[in-house]
Amino acid sequence: KNKTLYQAVTRWFSANMENAETELHYDSPFHLLIAVILSAQCTDKRVNMYTPAIFERFPQPSDLASASFEEVYQMIKSISFPNNKAKHLVGMAQMLVKDFGSEVPGTLEELVKLPGVGRKTANVIQSVVFNKAAMAVDTHVFRVSHRIGLVTKSCTTPLAVEKYLMKH
């Protein structure tokens, strides 16, 4: 039963969303990382309203790494959880400069070391930037996967849903 459902869902997405892409606007892996961090608990549409100014002010990790919390906060204060996100963005950029030669790392293990980057964000970066098979499980994927029976009731966390979907 599940295999048939997986095949039907896969067929539908192949036919209707062959090139599914993020709706976040970005022009580099670094800028996508900023946008995905900002998108937590916020709509992509809202994030896209603020990222052009952010990307112009912080074209490289070193620019953001040397910014003050207050400057970043002022630029993102209308996005959800600006205090945490401002701290995470500056810390993320500092770690990129210090530990990764100002490059966005390509592995899940490295990505989740960055402040503000959890599995979902890391999986988006893996998929979009590095074209790797990755499953970014947000609240919508979690809910719909349960609702249509793609996962079992024992999948009670986003990680469990991610692992189950990737396995099948």
Task: Show the residue positions of the predicted features.
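Catalytic cores of DNA base-excision repair glycosylases
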Residues: 1-168
